[in-house]
């Protein structure tokens, strides 16, 4: 059994977005925390400032020479392989070993928890809910899968019993959670490394729903509408219909955001304005409204909080503008996410804006996902004017030798007239140096390391701008 007392917590892979959030919460609660990762990053540096002992590198020595007593309970994610030397040392030393989902489940059990699940939209929706509870004075503890400026990170410790958490389905650990409120944004086939079929995915979400006291779910998703059941189910939709609890009409999507009138069971609540773009974010906002109204928060407070919300890091995050080119970083790595992101971007391109062309750069994530969803990946870039595909980011998967980024590009050429395949990040940088022009909105898409290229591409454009200015002065 997990102990929340004198026994320390040691996280193998503490620099990950999910692991670091849990480590932060435990450290802020006054528990002794340590962890290791292969290299330092911004998250490990923040944890070190809290007094968390950080080991760089993963080796048996981290536990064999552990600085605290007693030996820790060791926390791993699904990314940690069974042959990891630190994991093997934990087994040899008899350390209690838990999955990161066990820590989150234990924290939920001690709280009035709101868990946000879904194939897409988890981070934005959970961040929106957390921001609403903050603005409503409910002082929640927050654990999300992205960094949010409002609480300067991916986690926050509040003083109330409320906990807002993002609940990951990728490895099936969603089945461990028993939240007070379970939010399900959508259900689609993903993570084929874990799930063999859509039916398995639906079954996992159904068990999560069964274990929640109340479920709030999107009726626009066929797999929710037709397959999900719960005796206390609140639904929301972008379509005005009597069968749902929350819906909208008079929707206006613009380059600045979205406006809509919100309905609650046939009664108009008022007008909602959002600064985040696209239909998918309006859906996310409806989930937030349903949660807020269930908690007794008035619509004016909800609408004000949603208007102020500016998004999470790597969710259509603007990285800057150089030489008349706008750079966007987005985590989208599933076809539905990519399509939603590009459709939102399309709202900002045209005669009424400075932006005239969308250039999408996509790094496929995992061989298993790419192979399973190949046709959908080929079809989801129609809202872009030009697309560049890199080779696949493995995320630790072995290369099966049956799928590559070139296959994605070949598939995309059946549906798109302007496609490049640049296998390496260096090749992408070279191609963009010749391709980009003032008026471009370039979006870097994927869950791998593609976004690390953005500063270099921006620096190239800075250099081009300086060179052009120098030539103009010389003339």
UniProtKB/Swiss-Prot annotation:
Major site of localization recorded for this protein: cytoplasm
Associated pathway: Cell wall biogenesis; peptidoglycan biosynthesis
Residues where ATP binds: 118-124
Disulphide linkage map: none
Catalyzed reactions: UDP-N-acetyl-alpha-D-muramate + L-alanine + ATP = UDP-N-acetyl-alpha-D-muramoyl-L-alanine + ADP + phosphate + H(+)
Entry EC number(s): 6.3.2.8
Pfam families reported in the protein's UniProt record: Mur_ligase (PF01225), Mur_ligase_C (PF02875), Mur_ligase_M (PF08245)
BP terms from Gene Ontology: cell division; cell wall organization; peptidoglycan biosynthetic process; regulation of cell shape
UniProt subcellular location: Cytoplasm
GO cellular component, one term: cytoplasm
Source taxon at top rank: Bacteria
GO molecular function ontology, one term from the record: ATP binding
Alphabetic keyword roster: ATP-binding, Cell cycle, Cell division, Cell shape, Cell wall biogenesis/degradation, Cytoplasm, Ligase, Nucleotide-binding, Peptidoglycan synthesis
Gene3D superfamilies: Mur ligase, C-terminal domain, Mur-like, catalytic domain, NAD(P)-binding Rossmann-like Domain
Keyword Coiled coil listed: no
Function statement: Cell wall formation.
Similarity-based family: Belongs to the MurCDEF family.
UniProt-recorded name of the protein: UDP-N-acetylmuramate--L-alanine ligase
Species whose genome carries this gene: Thermosynechococcus vestitus (strain NIES-2133 / IAM M-273 / BP-1)
Lineage: Bacteria, Bacillati, Cyanobacteriota, Cyanophyceae, Acaryochloridales
């Amino acid at each position: 059994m997990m102990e929340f007392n004198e026994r320390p917590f040691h996280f193998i892979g503490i620099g990950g977005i999910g692991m670091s959030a849990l480590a932060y919460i435990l450290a802020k609660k006054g528990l002794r925390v340590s962890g290791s990762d292969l290299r330092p990053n911004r998250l490990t540096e923040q944890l070190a400032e809290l007094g968390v002992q950080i080991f760089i590198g993963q080796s048996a020595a981290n536990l064999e020479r552990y600085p605290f007593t007693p030996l820790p309970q060791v926390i791993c994610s699904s990314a940690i392989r069974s042959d990891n030397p630190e994991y093997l040392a934990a087994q040899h030393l008899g350390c209690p070993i838990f999955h990161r989902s066990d820590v989150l489940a234990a924290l939920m059990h001690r709280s009035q928890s709101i868990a946000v699940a879904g194939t897409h939209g988890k981070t934005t929706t959970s961040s929106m809910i957390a921001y609403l509870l903050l603005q409503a004075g409910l002082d929640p503890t927050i654990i999300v899968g992205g960094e949010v400026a409002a609480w300067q990170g991916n986690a926050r410790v509040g003083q109330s019993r409320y906990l807002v958490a993002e609940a990951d389905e990728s490895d099936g650990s969603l089945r461990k959670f028993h939240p007070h409120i379970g939010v399900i944004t959508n259900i689609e086939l993903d993570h084929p490394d874990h799930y063999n079929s859509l039916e398995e995915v639906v079954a996992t979400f159904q068990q999560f729903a069964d274990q929640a006291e109340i479920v709030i779910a999107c009726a626009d998703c066929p797999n929710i509408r037709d397959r999900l059941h719960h005796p206390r189910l609140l639904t929301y939709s972008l379509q005005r219909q009597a069968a749902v609890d929350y819906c909208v009409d008079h929707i206006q999507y613009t380059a600045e955001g979205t406006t809509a009138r919100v309905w609650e069971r046939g009664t108009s609540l008022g007008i909602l304005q959002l600064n985040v773009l696209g239909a998918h974010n309006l859906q996310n906002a409806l989930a937030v409204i349903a949660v807020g109204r269930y908690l007794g928060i008035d619509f004016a407070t909800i609408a004000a909080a949603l208007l102020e919300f500016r998004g999470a890091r790597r969710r259509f995050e603007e990285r800057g503008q150089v030489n008349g080119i706008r750079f966007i970083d987005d985590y989208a790595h599933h076809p539905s996410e990519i399509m939603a992101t590009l459709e939102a971007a399309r709202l900002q391109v045209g005669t009424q804006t400075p932006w005239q062309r969308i250039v999408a750069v996509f790094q496929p994530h995992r061989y298993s996902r790419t192979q399973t969803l190949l046709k959908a990946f080929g079809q989801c870039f129609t809202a872009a004017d030009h697309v560049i595909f890199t080779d696949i980011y493995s995320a630790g998967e072995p290369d099966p030798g049956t799928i590559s980024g070139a296959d994605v590009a070949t598939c995309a050429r059946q549906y798109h007239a302007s496609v490049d395949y640049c296998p390496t990040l260096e090749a992408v940088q070279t191609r963009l140096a010749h391709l980009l022009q003032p008026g471009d909105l370039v979006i870097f898409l994927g869950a791998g390391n593609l976004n690390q290229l953005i500063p270099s591409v921006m620096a190239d454009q800075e250099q081009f701008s300086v060179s052009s200015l120098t030539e103009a002065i010389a003339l």
